[in-house]
């Protein structure tokens, strides 16, 4: 009878300890979905206001407000504003005042053994990119852009766009939107610079399509990394010292009894 009571108390203590550790473990916040409320992607953390995608009140192809291909605002190829490749404004590639010009000075990454272990499983840490990792190759997503010309252009030129993305561990971000925002910016920037160095230039249509493609790939990468992060956390909880010792003690009592 005494052994039975001891075994029962040990079982209760084991379950309570395991549950307490599980609830206390840090997890990244999913953010409640794509672009829903609060300080969300796009445009988050943009000191120059011109990160992907361009900001403004207008939608795709509108004549005012910062949409794609507009004559005024922050769209692609504009003579004024902060879009890609503009002769005026503070947000273009390589310009001193824009947000993209700051990529040349990545912040010094902090050493974290958990991140290094995660990198070994997910991808190699890329040197010179502030601790970013390069994900595994993906099949380029099937995307419809709303018109036949862009759909056909994407099918014919998809090989020109990246099939891997750069990212940091998910536990460095508060939600999915922040992860995707950072992932899109660094991946597009790195691919554009590398390709331009080889003598190949991108058109306005290329840039629009590439960002949509990379965005979808970054969402997929976040989902993969989140799942792997939770699995690693569950394994660490299960095999941490207190639960293991209690479980072994309980099994010994049950066998002896």
Curated annotation (Swiss-Prot):
Residues 27-114 are annotated as: Disordered. Cu(2+) 3 binds at residues 80-82. A lipid is attached at residue 234 (GPI-anchor amidated alanine). It is found in: Cell membrane; Golgi apparatus. Residues 54-95 are annotated as: 5 X 8 AA tandem repeats of P-H-G-G-G-W-G-Q. GO terms for molecular function: amyloid-beta binding; aspartic-type endopeptidase inhibitor activity; copper ion binding; cupric ion binding; cuprous ion binding; glycosaminoglycan binding; identical protein binding; microtubule binding. Its primary physiological function is unclear. May play a role in neuronal development and synaptic plasticity. May be required for neuronal myelin sheath maintenance. May promote myelin homeostasis through acting as an agonist for ADGRG6 receptor. May play a role in iron uptake and iron homeostasis. Soluble oligomers are toxic to cultured neuroblastoma cells and induce apoptosis (in vitro). Association with GPC1 (via its heparan sulfate chains) targets PRNP to lipid rafts. Also provides Cu(2+) or Zn(2+) for the ascorbate-mediated GPC1 deaminase degradation of its heparan sulfate side chains. This is Major prion protein.
């Amino acid at each position: 009878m005494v052994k039975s009571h001891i075994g029962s108390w040990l079982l209760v203590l084991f379950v309570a300890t395991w549950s307490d550790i599980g609830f206390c473990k840090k997890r990244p916040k999913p953010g409640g979905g794509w672009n829903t409320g609060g300080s969300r992607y796009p445009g988050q953390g943009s000191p120059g206001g011109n990160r992907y995608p361009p900001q403004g009140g207008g939608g795709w192809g509108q004549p005012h407000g910062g949409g794609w291909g507009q004559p005024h605002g922050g769209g692609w190829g504009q003579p004024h504003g902060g879009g890609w490749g503009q002769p005026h404004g503070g947000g273009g590639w390589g310009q001193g005042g824009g947000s993209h010009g700051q990529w040349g000075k990545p912040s010094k990454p902090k050493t974290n053994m958990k991140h290094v272990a995660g990198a070994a499983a997910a991808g190699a840490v890329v040197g010179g990119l502030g601790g970013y990792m390069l994900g595994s190759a993906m099949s380029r997503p099937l995307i419809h852009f709303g018109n036949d010309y862009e759909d056909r252009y994407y099918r014919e030129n998809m090989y020109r766009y990246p099939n891997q993305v750069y990212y940091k561990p998910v536990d460095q971000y508060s939600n999915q939107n922040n992860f995707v925002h950072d992932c899109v910016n660094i991946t597009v920037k790195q691919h554009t610079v590398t390709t331009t160095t080889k003598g190949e230039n991108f058109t306005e249509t290329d840039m629009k399509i590439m960002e949509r493609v990379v965005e979808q790939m970054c969402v997929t990468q976040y989902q993969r990394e989140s799942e792997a992060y939770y699995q690693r956390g569950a394994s660490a909880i299960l095999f941490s010292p207190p639960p293991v010792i209690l479980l072994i003690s309980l099994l010994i009592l049950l066998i002896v009894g």
